């Protein structure tokens, strides 16, 4: 890792987790976020309040960092569902402004967080590998896929596209229509109903946040690594199975409110993770039941 350090664009759930991981390994880390100074940051992490659309600010930050990890995106699959203009304005447009600021720095190494849960749509077979066609069903997935296409104009040896699955764990904010595990745990703790969209047989790949940050840290430490990488656990869990796991962890029966399936929702997605296994000597270490237990304890301690 270069002494020039790592710039993380986006200080949300994943950006903060990555900053803590990399700083804990002794790397110099800066985080750019619109409200970076609102939350305390440990020593060794320089928090900068600002937006990626600020060309002058981005220019100054990029000049002092050799590696950039881009985690900022203004939509979720639910928030931009059926709203392509919102996806363009809140998701893709700010990213393109960042990419414009990056143009004078072709030597910068960029790791971009795409979306393994949405860009593939419903693939023909599972698990889905990185060379499968991109066929998103949602506006959010289309925005991420478009960003990936723009990145093909960058030097390929300095560009990594990361396609994470459904990441969960301590630190995840409660957002409507996003983060099923946190929502289920909150519903169980507060005796609130959980809205289940569709038949509950939707298959998802869930990755614990510490396993995610470990994978990204390993890639940043391998300067030869480039290209596209799926980041997941490599196994599928249905929503009904997830409900059962949360009920077993909490000892409470969830009250389910059945809702019609939503247009644009992926039905089945499990990621093939052989490429990241080989490139970074990485494998997920956290069982889903254990990750749910750790998340429940964190929620109880931070209620």
Say what each PLM segment does.
Residues 77, 112-126, 139, 145, ...:
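Conserved catalytic-site region of short-chain dehydrogenase/reductase
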Residues 6-10:
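Conserved N-terminal Rossmann-fold NAD(P)-binding element of oxidoreductases
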Residues 192, 197-303:
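C-terminal substrate-binding subdomain of Rossmann-fold SDR/epimerase-dehydratase oxidoreductases
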Residues 149-204, 209-214, 244-247:
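NAD(P)-dependent short-chain dehydrogenase/reductase
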